[in-house]
């Protein structure tokens, strides 16, 4: 639980950058994968109040923390794994995940689930910033290559990757769209 608080505080800048890359708009249905204590959801609601937010996280402790922060605002929180939870097909306009991708049990399966859950033309944004002892720009670039490969394997198009120097380490945000047809 303490790790969730620490990551949340360090993720504020990453959250804003990822939200900018995602381009949320009024009326969007958005899924956050790995919502932690709910700070990114809170930031999205500050930016655009008329969105429909859902979140999925494996941690019961994070679900309880996030519920106190965003539940009164009509956010739906789910305890579960992106790889196995039966998300509705073609339901979300946008999917966002910040510093969560590398802790999924199966990234390829998680990306395929995101693809299935997105509406045609929907967009996903996944950001990672290595925090391990061996964190380096090379590791960040490796994460980026893996995200691109997973997006391609799932059938996404318009895949883009951006890098940004945010302390303590170089960060990567990969975005991709589900084909409109």
From Swiss-Prot:
Keywords: Methyltransferase, Transferase. One of its GO terms (molecular function) is methyltransferase activity. It comes from the Bacteria. Its EC number is 2.1.1.-. The keyword Methyltransferase applies. InterPro entries: Methyltransf_25, SAM-dependent_MTases_sf. Transmembrane segments: none annotated. Pfam families: Methyltransf_25 (PF13649). One of its GO terms (biological process) is methylation. Belongs to the methyltransferase superfamily. This is Uncharacterized methyltransferase YdaC. It comes from Bacillus subtilis (strain 168).
